Regions:
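Acidic/histidine-rich catalytic neighborhood of metal-dependent amide-processing enzymes
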Residues: 1-22, 228
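Metal-dependent amide/peptide-bond hydrolase catalytic core
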Residues: 24-230
Length: 230
């Protein structure tokens, strides 16, 4: 078995991509009047401390590695994309959530990275939140947990797609695809190859150049001929 995932790679043969873990952290504090901050637990403040922790984790891996210079950026990254909490200025916010993610190099253990996050929450941040009240805390809602991809250049699928596209080299990308799932969970050798550029993805006026579509069509014609022969 083999698998070809048709995400936008400019028809380059991609054998490795980063994994991705994304989640929403729900912070539950205790409300009160802002003139008496000691009588409540400020969910926004603790959520902000969590965001700073994630930023520092990202800085740690940027500085200390592991590194792979064929990826851009060349290290595991952490990102906080959304923070929302509170109702008005003079009320201690009871609720806040943070949407965050990390994108790990394929050889950087996702479970180890998740462990760093939960260790910080369970052993540092939540105990601080519960110094006065024990009905406060943090819940993690997992949005996606996608393994990275690391397919060898000597795999049959890699050699086949290189031959059919005329590629001389393989590549690595920082965005994620279902390829990691097929490879890790289904034990199916997988590569990513498709028309268009990721630089035009997820933004207004997405487009794929006609030349890219023509190259993809030619590739599919050749692939179909190979499959018919087999």
């Amino acid at each position: 078995a083999m698998c070809i995932v048709g995400e936008p790679t400019n028809m380059q043969v991609i054998t490795q991509h980063k994994g991705k873990y994304s989640a929403r952290a729900h912070f539950t504090g205790r409300s009160g009047h802002s003139s008496l901050p000691g009588e409540g637990v400020n969910a926004v403040e603790f959520a902000s401390e969590f965001v700073v922790f994630l930023r520092r984790l990202g800085q740690k891996f940027r500085n200390e590695g592991p590194h792979d210079d064929e990826f851009v950026p060349n290290h595991t990254t952490f990102h906080s994309g959304v923070i929302h909490g509170g109702t008005q200025l003079n009320i201690i916010p009871q609720n806040c959530y943070v949407d965050f993610e990390f994108r790990n190099l394929p050889n950087h253990d996702r479970n180890e990275l998740k462990g760093l996050i939960f260790d910080y929450l369970d052993n540092t941040l939540i105990p601080q939140m519960r110094e006065t009240y024990d009905d406060v805390g943090v819940e993690i809602e997992v949005v996606s947990d996608m393994p990275g991809l690391a397919t060898g250049d000597d795999e049959e699928v890699t050699r086949l797609v290189m031959e059919l596209t005329g590629a001389n080299t393989t590549g690595k990308v920082s965005f994620g695809t279902e390829a990691g799932v097929f490879s890790a969970m289904g034990d199916i050798p997988t590569v990513v190859c498709g028309p268009g550029s990721i630089e035009q993805a997820h933004k207004p006026d997405e487009f794929i150049e006609l030349d890219q579509l023509a190259r993809c069509e030619a590739f599919l014609d050749k692939l179909l001929a190979v499959l018919v022969r087999k």
